[in-house]
């Protein structure tokens, strides 16, 4: 009987040890599997909104458009409370100094944007309970039980509790996000992507599948017959070299009626007698280029914009009811050919197009065949232009020569590592280069988005699409990387205001013989 009793005791002891081991394995398993799934990148999204077609006559009007996934908005004070914005204030210099951004952006995958909102009382209590629970368990395990389990178990437990803490923080973030009133704002752009865009270091592979597909389709379609025979620069030009290339080649050219078919049609009398590059003989000291992007809402940039000597706006972007954010002054307005031909824009009677210098443009074939373009423009801007000139002969109103827009396209392509869309640059990029030819300093607002980045295409329209910021028809992504390379503004200006500061051509000093190509 005694041997049996002894065996029975051994069996019971073995069973207790086995149960203890099983309990420990189950505990470790469930602790590991409790991690919150990381939020998928916004660039692997499944589209849930109905988008306008990316091709044909639904060509984007403005050069700053966007893709719908989440609805986020943000406020200065939220970031100030978290101490995030302060880490970006490093004064003038290169974007390479954005060490603070690197640290911040490593924490999460998504660019979480928020409006000022208070957490609910229940959420506060839950947070407190989580913290109390965590501290109690850390104390009990690491403080009292660690010696009993040995150093290895102690370190394993520490790692487990770090993981628990991260999971709690993610849980809190999701609770806070759920409590916000997103108010229709959206951004499908990840934080890491935005950071790279600020540094001018992104590629088409980082775009959403939809925008990648749109880019491939435009490359394949090549509607305008682009046959680029140039070559990409063998090395990346430094900012000064790139500025000299722009100064040398981005010479603003408008139609003057002296080229066929306009010369034979008697159009010379309709075009202004004074060339655009001589319209303001003394130029301007400082100028503002105001993007129509939704990110400019809630910026309070209006007074700063109006303080400039000249202000350029785009298409049908209004100022009325938006003065606080976009200002009220307008000196020049660039208009896409759709503005002249679409009755919804009221080109003939809207005050937006009066008492300002107008600059219109329309995509032409790549080789700038004026005959072909005149008889088959993308949108037939010529009849409304003629009508407007007859009614308002004293208003400066120009049509850009296609050679100018395609020369800008060539510069972008030569300084990009990938094939860009075979379509003209956006109105935004065209406007920036025109103002660089007129002003000593150019301040560009929300062309490269600030932390207020949103998928709201235009501040005055309720339409959301990531193509508005990153490009579908226009090679916007590559335009913005080029502009960022020559940006002389501070990191803080770009982060808070979406402001890029560029030197005008008159203030750029280049070698007389410059072989930079």
Curated annotation (Swiss-Prot):
InterPro entries: Glyco_trans_29 (IPR001675), GT29-like_sf (IPR038578). The chain crosses the membrane at residues 11-31. It comes from the Eukaryota. Its EC number is 2.4.3.1. It is a single-pass type II membrane protein. The keyword Transport does not apply. Residues 1-10 are cytoplasmic. It is an enzyme of class 2 (transferase). CDD domains: GT29_ST6GAL2. Residues 32-517 are lumenal. It catalyses: a beta-D-galactoside + CMP-N-acetyl-beta-neuraminate = an N-acetyl-alpha-neuraminyl-(2->6)-beta-D-galactosyl derivative + CMP + H(+). It holds the Pfam family Glyco_transf_29. The keyword Ribosomal protein does not apply. Belongs to the glycosyltransferase 29 family. Transfers sialic acid from the donor of substrate CMP-sialic acid to galactose containing acceptor substrates. This is Beta-galactoside alpha-2,6-sialyltransferase 2. The gene is st6gal2.
């Amino acid at each position: 009987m005694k041997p049996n009793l002894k065996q029975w005791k051994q069996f019971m002891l073995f069973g207790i040890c086995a149960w203890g081991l099983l309990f420990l394995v189950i505990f470790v398993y469930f602790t590991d599997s409790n991690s919150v799934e990381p939020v998928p990148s916004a660039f692997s999204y499944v589209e849930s909104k109905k988008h306008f077609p990316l091709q044909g006559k639904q060509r984007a009007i403005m050069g700053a458009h966007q893709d719908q996934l989440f609805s986020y908005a943000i406020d200065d004070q939220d970031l100030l409370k978290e101490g995030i914005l302060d880490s970006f204030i490093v004064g003038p210099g290169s974007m390479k100094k954005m060490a603070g951004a690197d640290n911040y952006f490593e924490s999460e995958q998504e660019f979480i944007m928020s409006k000022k909102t208070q957490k609910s009382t229940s959420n506060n209590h839950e947070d407190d309970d989580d913290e109390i629970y965590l501290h109690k368990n850390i104390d009990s395990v690491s403080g009292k039980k660690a010696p009993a389990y040995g150093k290895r178990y102690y370190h394993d437990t520490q790692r487990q509790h770090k993981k628990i803490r991260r999971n709690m923080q993610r849980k809190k973030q999701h609770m806070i996000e759920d409590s916000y009133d997103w108010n229709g704002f959206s951004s499908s752009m990840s934080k890491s992507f935005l950071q790279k865009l600020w540094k001018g270091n992104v590629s088409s592979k980082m775009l959403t599948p939809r925008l990648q597909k749109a880019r491939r389709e435009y490359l394949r379609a090549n509607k305008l017959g682009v046959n680029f025979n140039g070559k990409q620069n063998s090395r990346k030009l430094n900012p000064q070299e790139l500025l000299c290339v722009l100064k040398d080649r981005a010479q603003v050219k408008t139609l003057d009626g002296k080229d066929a078919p306009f010369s034979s049609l008697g159009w010379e009398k309709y075009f202004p007698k004074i060339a655009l590059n001589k319209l303001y003989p003394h130029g301007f000291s400082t100028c503002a280029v105001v993007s129509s992007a939704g990110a400019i809402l809630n910026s309070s940039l209006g007074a700063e914009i109006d303080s400039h000597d000249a202000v350029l706006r785009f298409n049908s972007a209004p100022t009325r009811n938006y003065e606080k954010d976009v200002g009220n002054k307008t000196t020049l307005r660039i208009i896409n050919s759709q503005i002249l031909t679409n009755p919804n824009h009221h080109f003939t009677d809207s005050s937006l197009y009066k008492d300002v210098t107008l600059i219109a443009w329309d995509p032409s074939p790549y080789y700038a065949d004026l005959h072909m373009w005149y008889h088959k423009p993308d949108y037939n801007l010529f009849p409304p232009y003629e009508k407007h000139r007859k009614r308002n002969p004293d208003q400066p109103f120009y049509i850009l020569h296609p050679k100018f827009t395609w020369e800008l396209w060539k510069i972008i392509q030569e300084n990009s590592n990938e094939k860009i869309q075979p379509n003209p640059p956006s109105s935004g990029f065209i406007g920036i280069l025109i103002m660089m030819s007129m002003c000593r300093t150019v301040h560009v607002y929300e062309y490269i988005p600030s932390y207020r980045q949103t998928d709201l295409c235009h501040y005055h329209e309720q339409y959301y699409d990531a193509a508005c910021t990153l490009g579908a028809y226009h090679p916007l992504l590559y335009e913005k990387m080029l502009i960022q390379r020559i940006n002389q503004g501070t990191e803080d200006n770009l982060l808070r205001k979406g402001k890029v500061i560029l030197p005008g051509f008159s203030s750029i000093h280049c070698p007389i013989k410059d072989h930079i190509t």
